[in-house]
Amino acid sequence: MRRARATALVPREFFLTSGRGISPTSPMNAFDRALMEAGIANCNLLLVSSIIPPKCRERRWKKLDAGAITPVVMAKAIGGPGETIGAGLAWAWEEEGRMGLVAEVEGHYDRRALITALDARIKEMAEARNFKIKDVKRRFEVMKVPQGVFGCVVVALVFVL
């Protein structure tokens, strides 16, 4: 008897996007505005872990259908008046192209601290897998939240199914 093979959704493309948002009403509304700026607010975002499949290629931003189930690796930071917040992703391919890794950083970070944390995390992820990685890329957003509002920064690696 033949065993059925499990079907897996394996993305073939991905793109990076980011946004910032502020709201006088709530942190959730600031997050919604950051997603709007990033161009993914009208998707049903599905958070996934930090592995880029083999042969998955990076592409330019793509408009996605409203309501689409959309897998993302996301970093987001939310803050109140006067706080500095940062979110970022670092991604890189294993030297032989077997897979890619994505590291997320989010919280109360300025630009320098965010970059340092991203570099340390992607390096440790590779070391844990005995990988050598090449061409580390980064995307990040940092914001000092204005007085009287909530702020949010978001960075997402969006898989295209």
Name these PLM-found stretches.
Residues 1-161:
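Helix-coil modules at protein/domain termini and other flexible surface or pore-lining loops
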